[in-house]
């Protein structure tokens, strides 16, 4: 395959330049990959040639007078830009800044001289980065090697860093690792040897309490382990780090330090609660993710503290917004204990009032921005009151939560972790370039700025998949989309992120095994819940929240469940079903999504999708073949819903235009349902195509319908086809996706990046000043404009 543009132009000279001339004559001055491929095929060029393979690598073209500008994806996380003269047949590589200026020339030429240029590359050049593509998302492994090598090359400095770091940790003034009897690193070395000699006289299972006076006399406290064996192991690791540093020893020792007791998890938008919230505006998988995450983290913290010899109860607080008019939920209660947890809580802090007609109600995640600075300020005080001290770790979620995490971590001076869940920039075509036209709906000027601030301020970033960071050979990753972009008249980003940076780590979540489990486990299933869901789905009983009935409820159910918005793309599945006689003959469509009455929602995207759903059901005459359920299913009922569909040998379809990860995909698979899910986003890595599920193209209706029809047809002929895929789906989730593994890894990351932050704190002052400037001059000025609009409502 020819990847090099110069060789491509040489090998396919006539076709190459003829095609680019065809591009330059199109009405659209900006074209993307799919449009270029369609033009290539429509123009009669050979799809089997090396030229076609090169065209697939072009992400975008800009047509100007007598030239075409190309954005070419050389490989994963590597892009080059070219200007091609169609008069002189010249190819010239250009910079990202030049490419962005060309885009501005087409989109908004009057802003060329007023657009601020941002460039984070000088800061990234000072930081460690992985070199090989396959290690993207494994930042901590490279960081461990980097830190251990630094301990060799700058021995005295890093020994002191390590010594000061472990002396730092205490609980309520009581030292956890070292006490003041140990004065410096040389003394520490001697005392380790003395302690190891003393410990050698005691059996490995000797409790700490029996030997604590010996250890304390030597300068060691109880946080090194619960018994002589654990303490001996950890002291040997510390001895190795001081004398012969090794990346494995560094990771294991730092991970064993009891340095995290209090965690703040930030998620302001939507209705964050435990009951009756899923399906409300801006409320979905993120809430499920965080609640499951909290329980797993708390359990792991308790276990690790016990192993360290500490009988302490950690505390986790999920910080969210208090909504006065909470629509019958608990979202107007200040404090709520998390079910099944020992000391984990939801803390709700209200937005400051300003205009009560706005701030007493739910506020869209796209309009939340003017209130977040005050929210962070008030939350700082509230968190201090609850924890009685600063938290040890702050985890931000989504753009708004990550912005608040940035503000809080800066004020608390603690480790900041970011979890994007989904970055809106990659969902909406040209959302940055035409930001001004979209501003009244989405306010991307603030959201993309918040993302830039969060990405570049976080000590480490958690992603659920590789593609979330760096995409694929053919498509750009969510984070990668922040490398180069322009918002004409506001700012252009010449270099916004480095996907190779060590802050990126892939840590995939799991599912709540008490709620989502395989359908054959009948003893675990509640008969009343099963009866209720079967009645809702298949009985044709009248319900004001349900559209449609099933003439033949025994047909194979095709099931989908999600929020009802443009990105979730439920209407695509309805079209597939509505235009396929084969599917309608053999199957029914069961949709659990949103509301069925547009007057029952304030979300304008949901309103549009509700209208579209009604239009499609009427157009395709589906009223007797569909059950569209427009109400919330509690978590226990959603788990049973998957199992009931599996019991009837149905399938689950997730047709999103883009899915950051895909919790519903995991939930369906672990229930034993064959899954057809979007190939854009997390499901591309969750599902092994054809082995334990199927990838679908959410814009290719014919191909998607054909895949579903073929699988259902094969399953009717041979029941083992369905059985095999069902078992493989369960196996995939069981082996790969676990909250236990997730929580253990996240806490280990938090400790290692905490050490790195401590050891290199002064080196971050320059980027922090840059971020502060962006926040105050760009973000706050845009937020002020939106607040003024809200005050007029």
UniProtKB/Swiss-Prot annotation:
GO terms for molecular function: sucrose synthase activity. Signal peptide: none annotated. One of its GO terms (biological process) is sucrose metabolic process. It holds the Pfam family GT-B_Sucrose_synth. Optimum temperature is 80 degrees Celsius. Retains about 40% activity after 15 minutes at 65 degrees Celsius. It is an enzyme of class 2 (transferase). InterPro entries: Glyco_trans_1, Sucrose_synth_GT-B1, Sucrose_synthase_pln/cyn, SUS_EPBD, SUS_N. Its EC number is 2.4.1.13. Residues 259-738 are annotated as: GT-B glycosyltransferase. Optimum pH is 7.0. The keyword Glycosyltransferase applies. Disulfide bonds: none annotated. It comes from the Bacteria. Keywords: Glycosyltransferase, Transferase. It catalyses: an NDP-alpha-D-glucose + D-fructose = a ribonucleoside 5'-diphosphate + sucrose + H(+). Homotetramer. Catalyzes the reversible conversion of sucrose and a nucleotide disphosphate (NDP) into fructose and NDP-glucose; although the reaction is freely reversible in vitro, the physiological reaction seems to be sucrose cleavage. Unlike characterized plant enzymes prefers ADP as a cosubstrate, whereas plants prefer UDP. Its preference for ADP over UDP suggests it may directly link sucrose and glycogen metabolism. Belongs to the glycosyltransferase 1 family. This is Sucrose synthase. It comes from Melioribacter roseus (strain JCM 17771 / P3M-2).
